[in-house]
Amino acid sequence: MLLLRLNTTSWMNSVLACVMLVLGLFVPIFANAYTGVTIVMSAETPANLEFVDQLKVELAKNKLVNLRVNVITLPDTEKLVVAENSELVIALGVKALEAASKLRRSTPVLGAFTPLPAFNSIMAKNKRELGNFSAIILDQPFSRQMSLIKHVLPEAQKIGILLGTTSSQYIDYVREEGEKRGLNILEEKVSQEADLIPQLKKLLDSADGILAIPDPTIYSRETAQPILLTSYRYQKPIFGYSQSYVRAGALAAVYSTSKQLAKQAAEIAIKSRPAPSDLPPPQMPKYFSIMLNYQVARSLNIPLMDEDEILKKMLESDAPEAM
């Protein structure tokens, strides 16, 4: 009996030693895991509120993760205090990301609804580093936009783009993705608003369509109507970057909804929770939708497939991209 007891004790000690070793490996990781999410909104817009609601839904789906969600808006700046690693800050919009970037550098921050140039500028200005500072970039991958163009205009060979100060940095990527799909990219630079329509007309003389790349120098509420009307006179389509641009007269656009961005943010929050200082690099929207303007298509004599059919074909060939 004594021998049996000694053997049993020895076996138990071995098991306990293994357990302690395993716990020793995992405790440092989970000790720093954040327990909550603080969402900072630039404003209480419908898009931001929809994002918040969907994020809560997505987080609730994971029964193994119980993250409390706190929501504040920029006017409540005195409330923008978080317990460093114990909370993930999700900033909605450029102004919100700017405010969140001023928190302690150890605080994990994830941006959304933020263009890539704005993210890079904020990160450099506030000396933040990748790892605990990231974002779901607002811009859609050029590969995805070219895919939409080829599905809508399969015979297209030349696509024009207007380049401003911000969008000029993308030209090499646009050309690369265009070449992959047999599209020759034509570009004209716009340095001031007076050059906008003349440069657009140059493109419309040769291009089969225009791809709009977000740039404050070129695309705004004030310039939308003259751009769309000019392209219509030339009987050439505009491929926009938002639902509102399609409603205004663009032929098509690929975009991500607030719910889709919230789903992606929730996935990042859950995956990175054990290691808050290990956020993924900035990434393009993973989930997306498309919108077509059938009235514009009829006016331009462009036959279109069903919206769902085009989306299905795009999804089959689409792959999410990191920056």
Labelled PLM ranges:
Residues 2-19:
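Bacterial N-terminal signal peptides that target proteins for export
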Residues 31-323:
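Short hydrophobic alpha-helices and adjacent helix-cap/hinge residues
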Residues 26-28:
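N-terminal signal peptide c-region/cleavage motif recognized by signal peptidases
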